[in-house]
Amino acid sequence: MQEDLIIQKNLFAIGNDNNKQKEKTKIPEDLSLEDLKKESQKRPRQRKNSTNLINKFKTDLISNKKNVCINEESYSYKTVSKLKLTPVMKHYVTLKEENKDRLLLYRLGDFFECFFEDAVLISNLLEITLTSKDAGKEIGKIPMAGVPHHAMDRYCADLIKKNYSVVICDQLEKSSGNYGTPIKRGITRIITPGTVIEEGMLIAKKNNWITAIYLSEENSNESYEWGISKADVSTGELITLEGQSLSKLFDEIIKLDSSEIIVGSNAVRNLLIKGNSQITYTVSQETNFGINEANYLIKNYFQIANLEGIGLKNLKNATRSLGGLLNYLEKINPSNLDKDSSVKISLDFPQIQYGHNKLIIDYQTQKNLEIKNTQRENNYVGSLLWSIDRTYTCMGARCLRRWIDSPLLNVNEIYKRQNIITNFFESKKLRTDTQNLLRAMGDLERLAGRACAGHASPRDLIAIAEGLKKLPRLKSIIELFKYDLPNWTDQLINIDEGLLELADTISFKLVENPPLSISEGGMIHDGVDNILDGLRNLMDDYSEWLNKEELKERKISKISNLKIQFHKNFGYYISINKSKVNLAPQHWIKRQTLTNEERYITSEIKNKENKIFQIKSRASSKEYEIFCELRNIVAEKTKQIRSIAKSIASLDALLGLSITSIENNFIKPLLIPINDSMTKNSTKIIAGRNPIVEQLLSDKKFVANDISFEDNQKLIILTGPNASGKSCFIRQLGLIQILAQIGSFVPANNAEIKIADRIFTRIGAVDDQSSGQSTFMVEMSETASILNQATSNSLVLLDEIGRGTSTFDGLSIAWSVSEYLAKKIQCNTIFATHYHELNYLKNSNKNIQNFQVLVEQNDDQLIFSHRIVRGGSNKSYGIEAAKLAGVPKEVIEKAKSVLNSLEENNKLNHNIK
């Protein structure tokens, strides 16, 4: 209300002494709309152009300041003359020139400031005030915006989330107190979206990938060779792969889900943007992707004699991409900024990702099956991952996400995962004991990474120690497991004694609840260091002296409630109530007057204060030194900690899958290996259910359905009305296939599942405006990709083909595609369609079988049973579905009339050969 009143006063001069003058220009109330139109034509108003922040800054500066030099060069570090700048601004511009594509935060006193274009940008991004700073007599005012130094991490997190990289220039020494003496400043951190390790800048249950892409210089789209290397510097994971053709590269890039993608030139970036304009690429022209440089960097980083030992001997493009990634990380690594620093980015040996050892799920299939996010809203809730994730640690959640991205092909490895789920499934005590151990466990992968990078806090180290102390109890649980177990369980049974000793060392040196700040002391236990203990003894002596001094001054002044207190700005002082001022002795020196309090100092207190500060400073420095030594010890164990953390993560993921199985009545499937010549069995699922839809149906029971590809009947033609459940059914098979191949139990009463080498989906289609492709062309491109890449071991899920063209063209294409899949490729396929003519394919091809969604019609009312039964449907019930959707009755009646006419005059010949 107060704000409204102020606005009214300003606009209408309410309560203003000038009201009498305003009355002279009072607007007549009887003006008609025509009068106002004539007035506007008589004196037309000119449109005012909107101004950007820089122009607004100039306008405000000119209107509010006199004698200010306004030049275009004042607003850009690129055009400003360094010779005209103050020493501080000259240093800022020099650093900015070296970091053109990053925001530079420059420490000045208690603030980190930005200038020139960066100031305008961050004032907009962070919604902070844009102000100005004097850059020298000849330059005048320049734009400035800043954030408090204590809140810098929070603001950096906001910038990182908006995909900006940040350079931190901090003060490297304390102010000498001499005005005019420059303070030494330098770059202490470079933070990019792909290299953050701070907890507040990361998504706990998701990897934070930074990716480097090498692209060969070829002309043909299909002859382009490429290499990709991606790393999560917070967990140490490193994956590399290579391939051929731009189409495959574009698909891999979309699947990467990277926070930052590095390429070596604008030409490469421009080429990749054609594949997907929604992805941002960082062009690092100084990054070297040369093969010789890559060989040197990789061998030097991993301390190996050759590349053969890590599987890169014959993978030149993968090697180039990994070399480029390491080259980029080296340039932004803090250890390169400070040669004496012991910190580094620690990465594991690269995992070589081959197409032949994992189930391939391309981006389109991930999207269609809603594996990690829903298709329409891109939400986590409603995805496959949401439906099965019952993990207790962030490590386990990330592990499960990786498994879903790359399910296994090796049946023996899958069975070993199943065995752990079975152990948990059969024993509530094993589940409960493991849950209790994992529930409060910290993120050991990322905690170790922060220690290695020199950013771990005392609380981080305590969390590492607490996690490592649980290893013996985890060992006792694993030893109770039956059946054949994965190799990674060996680490949990044969525990590295060095890790247990490390946990004891951390607990011995650090207090249980250390402070957040590492510069103010209070984090190291007594008895850890003789020098620190000696300093603390002296501190105790001075504390005792202060207590005695307080009693002495009370006695002298006869003020019983007198206190000696401490303030960070004033130091130690005597505090008395204002009513006792008349009792203050003459040797007291007045320091500060407050509303109800007077503060004094004495020469004795001041003398002791200096000594107390010196001892406190030495003690804090000693604690910091001890802590840094301890952090370095932890950093040396980073690889061992991360290795055991990955085993814990796998255990957590399987524990979560066991809980999902119990909650949702999943069963253990029997798996049929690829190319199993001993059996002709194929996928057979009894009472299968869609794991996502079933959990979303809170008040309804999901209708389970069977499916079988036995007796070489590889292709199922599925017909039925719209909204009857066809799409749900074909997605259900894809989801069950993925669950089975990550080692999970599946939603069914019984299941035999043949291992698939790849899942293809063609479900729905929209036009692709970025590439200029129509809906039909997108549909045909996806179909062509399936026909050209599917093998007899693939799983193909089709939901309509040929809808975007004429009926005869569409039917012809659908017919031909079906025959090609059944006769030539012979892979397990479900084809949901409204072309009922395709049911006749069964008559001429023994590999094809017909199924339909059962529906009942009561007068004009459709009743969906969602039951899948053998046999083909001969009616789509499209008009009935339109009626259910609320289409006007007049339109429905007309549609019925047209349909009857078409059926009479355009009967199709079903004897197509």
From Swiss-Prot:
A single GO BP: mismatch repair
Phylogenetic placement of the source organism: Bacteria, Bacillati, Cyanobacteriota, Cyanophyceae, Synechococcales
UniProt-listed HAMAP family: MutS
InterPro entries recorded: DNA_mismatch_repair_MutS (IPR005748), DNA_mismatch_repair_MutS-lik_N (IPR007695), DNA_mismatch_repair_MutS/MSH (IPR017261), DNA_mismatch_repair_MutS_C (IPR000432), DNA_mismatch_repair_MutS_clamp (IPR007861), DNA_mismatch_repair_MutS_core (IPR007696), DNA_mismatch_repair_MutS_N (IPR016151), DNA_mismatch_repair_MutS_sf (IPR036187)
Annotated disulfide bonds: none
Gene3D superfamilies: 1.10.1420.10, DNA repair protein MutS, domain I, MutS, connector domain, P-loop containing nucleotide triphosphate hydrolases
One Gene Ontology cellular component annotation held by this UniProt entry: cytosol
Alphabetized GO MF terms: ATP binding; ATP-dependent DNA damage sensor activity; damaged DNA binding; mismatched DNA binding
Name used for this protein in its record: DNA mismatch repair protein MutS
Organism: Prochlorococcus marinus (strain MIT 9301)
Its job: This protein is involved in the repair of mismatches in DNA. It is possible that it carries out the mismatch recognition step. This protein has a weak ATPase activity.
Region of interest (Disordered), ranges: 18-50
Compositional bias segments (type: Basic and acidic residues): 19-42
Keywords noted in UniProt: ATP-binding, DNA damage, DNA repair, DNA-binding, Nucleotide-binding
Presence of keyword ATP-binding: yes
Family (UniProt): Belongs to the DNA mismatch repair MutS family.
Keyword Oxidoreductase part of the UniProt annotation: no
Superkingdom classification of source: Bacteria
Gene: mutS
Pfam (any one): MutS_I
Binding site for ATP: G720, P721, N722, A723, S724, G725, K726, S727
